[in-house]
C-alpha cells in the first residue's frame, strides 16, 4: 500500500489549473457547455465532490474521459479517509498475513 504525505490534487485544482486557466475558459462557459448550473462548476473548483453524472458531462465538454475525473476524486477520497481512520486501523486484527509481511520473515 503506497502512502503519500501530501493530499492528491483535487478535481477542482486540476480543472482550474490544467484546463480552465490555460484554455481561457470561464466557469460560466464550462457550466453552459455541460448543461449544468454555474454553481455546480463553482462548487467543484472550490473543493466540492465530483459525482459520476457530472464527471460524464465534464469529460464530454473537455474531451477526456469520466474515468480521468473520477480517478482524481477517488484518490482524494481515499487519502482523506485513510488519514482520518489510520489510528482505528491499527486495532484491526488481520485474518491473513500479507505477502509483504511474509517476505520479511
From Swiss-Prot:
UniProt key word DNA-binding: yes
Domain HTH cro/C1-type: 15-69
NCBIfam families attached to this UniProt entry: antidote_HigA
Protein's UniProt name: Antitoxin HigA-1
Pfam family, one: HTH_3
Family annotation (SUPFAM superfamilies): lambda repressor-like DNA-binding domains
Signal sequence range: none
DNA-binding residue intervals: 27-46
Induction info: Induced by amino acid starvation. Induced by the protein synthesis inhibitors chloramphenicol, kanamycin and to a lesser extent by spectinomycin.
Domain of life: Bacteria
Note: HigB-1/HigA-1 has been shown to stabilize plasmids very efficiently in E.coli.
Single GO molecular function: DNA binding
Functional description taken from the UniProt entry: Antitoxin component of a type II toxin-antitoxin (TA) system that counteracts the effect of the HigB-1 toxin. Binds to its own promoter and regulates transcription of the higB-1/higA-1 operon.
Record carries keyword Transcription regulation: yes
SMART domains: HTH_XRE
Record key words, sorted: DNA-binding, Toxin-antitoxin system, Transcription, Transcription regulation
Amino acid at each position: 500500500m503506497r502512502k503519500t504525505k501530501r493530499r492528491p490534487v483535487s478535481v477542482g485544482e486540476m480543472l482550474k489549473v490544467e484546463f480552465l486557466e490555460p484554455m481561457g475558459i470561464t466557469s460560466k462557459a464550462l457550466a453552459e457547455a455541460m448543461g449544468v448550473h454555474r454553481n455546480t462548476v463553482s462548487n467543484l473548483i472550490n473543493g466540492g465532490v465530483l459525482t459520476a453524472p457530472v464527471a460524464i458531462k465534464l469529460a464530454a465538454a473537455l474531451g477526456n474521459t469520466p474515468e480521468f475525473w473520477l480517478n482524481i476524486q477517488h484518490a482524494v477520497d481515499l487519502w482523506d479517509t485513510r488519514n482520518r481512520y489510520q489510528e482505528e486501523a491499527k486495532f484491526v486484527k488481520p485474518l491473513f498475513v500479507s505477502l509483504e509481511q511474509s517476505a520479511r520473515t
